């Protein structure tokens, strides 16, 4: 992760921070606070500590990842060379704000879903920002969600385009089973109740019901139950699930709801860095 963080800082600084170089002498030590300006769930504290260590900036934690935030609360106190603190300020805040926004939205969605389905999981998708996947998925985890796949090698997930090329679900599942380790689960994305049954009969571990209405999902689960297949698979719902309908989907009885919404549409939590004084 530090390679990614270093590159972010290099991209932000360019050749030098010309304003700070003009105004502040190297060796000027300051104390600064990172403060929240609104409510939320904090995430990115450990990332901030990684950045601070890289530049010999000491940190006092007032909040840990996953803690609730109110407006005006201190999250971290930094002490170090003013030039270093000002150099990393924007990158540190950007990551913390983005991660905190995702954690906040994830926790909200999880609470809504579990109000009607106590054991349900809320999972991310791979609809993440290139280069920021790890940070965004970690934020989902901090908010209480499931990371789902980090990468393509985490789980064999047979999607509609795979099936379109191979020709049918049964052959796709068989060929994946023959190719991957027994330690990897096989998930099949389907768009109809009939295909959900076919995927379960073919031996899928997870069946993803994509872009189905809550009513169709209920009918699909009933059909799997009627055929004695329901206990053989984890059923996941995805596609078009947002804050205004998550309870409807959770109440169907699926084990997992996966949402691109929690990483793609989260509003960053407003944080600021304030220099408290010279040290």
UniProtKB/Swiss-Prot annotation:
Q: Which UniProt keywords apply?
A: Glycosyltransferase, Pyridine nucleotide biosynthesis, Transferase
What does the record give as its pathway? Cofactor biosynthesis; NAD(+) biosynthesis; nicotinate D-ribonucleotide from quinolinate: step 1/1
Molecular function terms from GO: nicotinate-nucleotide diphosphorylase (carboxylating) activity
Against InterPro entries, the record matches this protein to: Aldolase_TIM, NadC, NadC/ModD, Nicotinate_pribotase-like_C, Quinolinate_PRibosylTase_N_sf, Quinolinate_PRibosylTrfase_C, Quinolinate_PRibosylTrfase_N
What are its GO biological-process terms?
Answer: NAD biosynthetic process; quinolinate catabolic process
Q: Which residues bind substrate?
A: 90, 125-127, 149, 159, 189, 210, 238-240, 259-261
EC number per UniProt: 2.4.2.19
Cellular compartments per GO CC? cytoplasm
The entry's family comment says: Belongs to the NadC/ModD family.
Quaternary state and interactors: Hexamer formed by 3 homodimers.
Q: What does this protein do?
A: Involved in the catabolism of quinolinic acid (QA).
Q: What is this protein called?
A: Probable nicotinate-nucleotide pyrophosphorylase [carboxylating]
């Amino acid at each position: 992760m530090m390679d990614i963080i270093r590159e972010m800082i290099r991209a932000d600084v360019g050749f030098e921070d010309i304003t700070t170089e003009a105004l502040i002498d190297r060796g000027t030590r300051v104390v600064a606070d990172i403060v929240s300006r609104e409510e939320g769930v904090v995430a990115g504290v450990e990332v901030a500590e990684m950045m601070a260590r890289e530049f010999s900036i000491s940190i006092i934690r007032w909040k840990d990842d996953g803690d609730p935030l109110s407006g005006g609360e201190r999250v971290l106190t930094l002490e170090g060379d003013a030039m270093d603190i000002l150099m990393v300020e924007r990158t540190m805040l950007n990551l913390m704000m983005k991660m905190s926004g995702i954690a906040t939205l994830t926790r909200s969605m999880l609470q809504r879903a579990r109000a009607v389905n106590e054991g349900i999981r809320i999972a991310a998708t791979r609809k993440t920002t290139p280069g920021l996947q790890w940070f965004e998925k970690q934020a989902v985890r901090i908010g209480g969600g499931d990371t789902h796949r980090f990468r393509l090698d985490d789980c064999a997930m047979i999607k509609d385009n795979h099936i379109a090329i191979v020709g049918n679900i049964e052959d796709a599942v068989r060929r994946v089973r023959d190719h991957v380790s027994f330690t990897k689960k096989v998930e099949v994305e389907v768009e109809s109740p009939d295909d959900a049954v076919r995927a379960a009969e073919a031996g899928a571990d997870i069946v993803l019901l994509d872009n189905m209405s809550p009513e169709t999902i209920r009918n699909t689960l009933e059909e799997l139950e009627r055929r004695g297949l329901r206990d053989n698979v984890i059923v996941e719902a995805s596609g078009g699930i947002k804050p205004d309908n998550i309870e409807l989907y959770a109440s169907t009885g699926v084990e997992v709801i996966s949402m691109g919404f929690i990483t793609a549409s989260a509003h960053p939590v407003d944080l600021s860095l304030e220099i408290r004084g010279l040290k």
